[in-house]
Amino acid sequence: MIDPNKADLRSEPREERDLMIAAKNGWLITLDNLSHIKPWLSDALCRLATGGGFAVRQNYTDDEEIIIEAKRPILLNGIEELATRSDLLERAIVLILPTIREEKRRTEAQFWREFEAVRPLILGALLDVVSGALREYESVRIEKLPRMADFALWATACETARKNADVS
């Protein structure tokens, strides 16, 4: 919606370096049609979600490094339950979507026409919620903070702002 990228849907990276290069060159990482998540990728996604760096020796040198630092939102798509390790699950919002009934199906061209018609409304609603969450954040209280406490506070502030903005 706000980060157009020629490779907006990517396949599973072969190594962490590929993931971090993608993160350096875009604001949203979208991995499409995954069958499962290998342990090394789960760990790398955790670092990327909360902020981390990747260092590798610079080509044609003995002692120089290239360091890539990034903190990015990530979308994962697959048929099976993808996140199985607790550290990744604690950083995730899991959505299990129903199968689209036959009578509700449409072509991709039709979908995008309908989406473009409401795009300004969607973006406006999202910005209203973010603006409200920024106002609410300092007053948010959670009785028992979970492991990802800052995210929980932000999500709660967004939820409160959404209710106050009457965005559906």
Language-model segment annotations:
Residues D3-S42, G53-N77, E81-S168:
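Feature primarily recognizes SF3-like P-loop helicase cores of small DNA viruses
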Residues L48:
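Conserved catalytic core of Hanks-type protein kinase domains
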